[in-house]
Amino acid sequence: MLAIEGGLHEDAALIEACALLHDIGKLDVPPEIISKPGKLTPAEFEAVKAHARFGAQRIHDAIRLLEVAEITALLHHEKWDGAGYEGLVGENIHLFARIIAVADVADALLSERVYRARWSLSDTLAYMQAESGKHFDPQWIEVLMRCEDKLKNMYEGEEK
């Protein structure tokens, strides 16, 4: 409201988002200090003041996450052989996107969907293996195959 009233129409949404995060550093201050009804001791006040630095650090740490999340959101439909949305090939596809592509497709196949039944673990792993070197980075398919028992434990409750 203030940003718009002050003529900052283009920045209003960004300012609103920043307003939601400005006190995130209070998560690092003990709750008994944050909610103390009386006067703070000097040490408690120093802890409250530190929330600004804590918040800045949390946001700084999130920057890498957002940078990589942007890349993986764009590239998770790339295929090892270049047949993906952006046409990148092999190791030109960001490592994290290659890993997420394997996990995303395996999870999609192993999960019930409104338009189809879930696949069995053996069918899923056979499909993933068949797509190694085409759709998926072969290295990460090998890793997926090593996770068969873990996948069985994760998805066994969903077997019908």
Regions found by a protein language model. Name each.
Residues M1-K160:
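Histidine- and acidic-residue-rich, metal-dependent catalytic cores
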